[in-house]
């Protein structure tokens, strides 16, 4: 845990819309820390340090949450679970953080990044994408920030399946191996695999 980034927050004592509005005026974000044992701890996060750490770790990288209070200070590894934004302002309205155990696998959604240009699209094919993110299962420190998929060799009538993914060691996905992620089809044609969900 020593090499993880750390965010220092305080316990939030006053709850509700009124107190939350007052927090925002002080550049603080209301939030909840969900511990791995099932407790919910209301917290308030400093806006600028949280924005900085979010830009560095995103939604999939573990960091340390240090909660300061009059009685005790606790530190726990966490990931960002849910973010709420103001509809107009580019500011966080509420943050949920989820406590993790570093040696226990968790299930988490990770974005897919496609690189290259599918060669089938150069001869009239149409790229059909079924997933832009994947649910992975791994120990928290093994979770990649994204899965990169090179589609350069993808020809018309061909698909890339879950079985074709080169996942990091210790990482697996919750999907069946025959689940198609992306295909190249003829314009107006049917996709190679019937997708569900």
UniProtKB/Swiss-Prot annotation:
This is Large ribosomal subunit protein bL25. GO terms for molecular function: 5S rRNA binding; structural constituent of ribosome. NCBIfam families: bL25_bact_ctc, PRK05618.3-1. It comes from Lawsonia intracellularis (strain PHE/MN1-00). InterPro entries: Rbsml_bL25/Gln-tRNA_synth_N, Ribosomal_bL25/Gln-tRNA_synth, Ribosomal_bL25_b-dom, Ribosomal_bL25_C, Ribosomal_bL25_long, Ribosomal_L25_dom, Ribosomal_uL5_bac-type. One of its GO terms (cellular component) is cytosolic large ribosomal subunit. One of its GO terms (biological process) is translation. CDD domains: Ribosomal_L25_TL5_CTC (cd00495).
